Each structure stands twice: as C-alpha cells, then as structure tokens.
Design a protein with these regions (language model features):
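Conserved ATP-binding subdomain of kinase catalytic cores across diverse folds
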Residues: 1-97
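Short beta-alpha connecting loops at secondary-structure transitions
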Residues: 169-171
Length: 171
C-alpha cells in the first residue's frame, strides 16, 4: 500500500455515519461521483467472485450505503473485525506505512494453518483487484481479518475499493 497524494488533506475528507447495520458515506466536492465510483468498483469485485461488502447508492448519487458484514439482521455483532493497521501495531496515521509483504506475514501469524493457503490466495486477489481497478488509496485499514467461531479466522470481504485514477492527485 502507498499513500495517494492529497489523501490526508481536509478538502478530500468526506462525512461518514455508522449504524448497527450500515456505514453511510457522504460525498466530497473534490471527489465527484465518489459514491457511484465505489459502488461500481465494489460490483467489479463481487462479480469477479470475491467476497465484497454490499453497497447501494442514494437516489441523488451523493451517498453510499455499505452493508456491514460483521453484524446480523438486527445489527448485533456476530464477527470480530481487526484491520491490518491494528494487527501491525500502527497508529491510524501510519496506515500507509507498511507493505503487502508485512501484511502477508501478519496474516500467516493470525490465520490457522489449515486456512492459511486459501487466505494468502485471497490476499493476492485483493492486491490484484486494487491494481486492476487502479485504487491508489488501498492501505492497511482497508484490509482486515474477521474472527468467527473458534479457529475461524479469515480475510474480511473487500471494502472501500475505489478507482482513484478518476481523481486528480490520486494517480
């Protein structure tokens, strides 16, 4: 992962609202059509066979609703989720300060041996997806492990994938 130019600027930030069942992301004037961009990019992931968070775009196109994959229909947590920023003991401001190799090494440490090869393959698919859709803003907070029943540790469905090349400063 590498930091996209301008991604930490205040003018690139957008409002987000978390509910028990969804994450609602607002738009930014500097990133036009971001909700539609993310929705379509997530559809590419889903249609390629990758587990991906489900998304919907508001009628006015200004908001994206991301269905949470860690809660049940009533909004109760059913899965533990931990992103690689946390797993690598990085502060949120350091989310770009790692490599895919370090993420893979961390994955090997947390995922049981029986699931490891499949999860490393999934990690490779995530890397390829972000390359193919030209997402220059993939970082360690956008890749996570989910914890289900005892011994069930796997990569979370992909989320927060955007074709950033559509925006000046993210090329």
């Amino acid at each position: 992962p590498g930091q996209a130019p301008g991604s930490e600027d205040a003018e690139f930030r957008k409002a987000s609202f978390v509910t028990p069942r969804a994450i609602i992301k607002g738009s930014s004037a500097r990133l036009p059509h971001l909700a539609l961009n993310e929705h379509l990019t997530m559809e590419v992931a889903r249609r390629s066979g990758m587990p991906a968070a489900r998304t919907l775009v508001s009628e006015d196109g200004l908001a994206l609703v991301v269905e949470r994959f860690d809660t049940d229909a009533q909004g109760h947590p059913v899965l533990g989720v931990e992103d690689f920023c946390s797993l690598l003991a990085l502060r949120p401001a350091e989310k770009y300060d790692t490599t895919w190799e370090r993420i893979a090494q961390s994955l090997r440490s947390y995922v049981p041996a029986a699931q490891r090869a499949k999860q490393l393959e999934t990690l490779l698919q995530i890397v390829v997806l972000n390359y193919v859709v030209r997402n220059a803003d993939c970082h360690s907070k956008n890749v996570a492990l989910i914890y289900g029943d005892a011994g069930d540790v796997r990569l979370a469905p992909v989320y927060d994938v955007v074709t950033t090349v559509a925006y000046t400063g993210f090329r």
